[in-house]
A protein has these predicted regions:
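Preference for bulky hydrophobic residues occupying beta-strand positions
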Residues: 45-47, 95, 107
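Active-site nucleotide-donor binding segment shared across nucleotidyl transfer reactions
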Residues: 18-60
Length: 109
């Protein structure tokens, strides 16, 4: 899913669009999503299970990947955990913005 005329929007506007899409998917599957970061270079998201029957974290990450048309990073199939044991995924977004950097989402569940 890409916003219309994505080449005419800023990176921050694209991240805002991606955040809304991720929150919609998360809500449908028992999660709440919060931003932790500035949304200037990447989009740092935390997904928190909100109901007892929330889907598996990797399933949620795969749903985000699909809705955004993103690509898996090299560690996608390796279980990477944060210091506190949360699962971590990086979604490479298939867009290039004028400043030449590829946007991505760092997702912690």
């Amino acid at each position: 899913m890409k916003p219309k005329n994505y080449k005419t929007i800023t990176l921050e506007e694209y991240y805002d669009f991606a955040l809304k899409a991720c929150r919609h998917i998360a809500l449908e599957h028992g999660y709440a999503v919060a931003v932790h970061g500035t949304m200037k270079t990447d989009l740092d998201l935390v997904a928190v299970p909100w109901v007892s029957k929330a889907i598996h974290p990797k399933t949620l990450a795969n749903k985000f990947l699909k809705i955004l048309g993103g690509e898996k990073n090299a560690l996608w199939d390796t279980e990477v955990r944060s210091v506190h044991g949360h699962l971590k995924y990086t979604i490479i977004l298939p867009l290039d913005f004028e400043y030449g950097k590829t946007p991505y989402i760092d997702l912690t569940i």
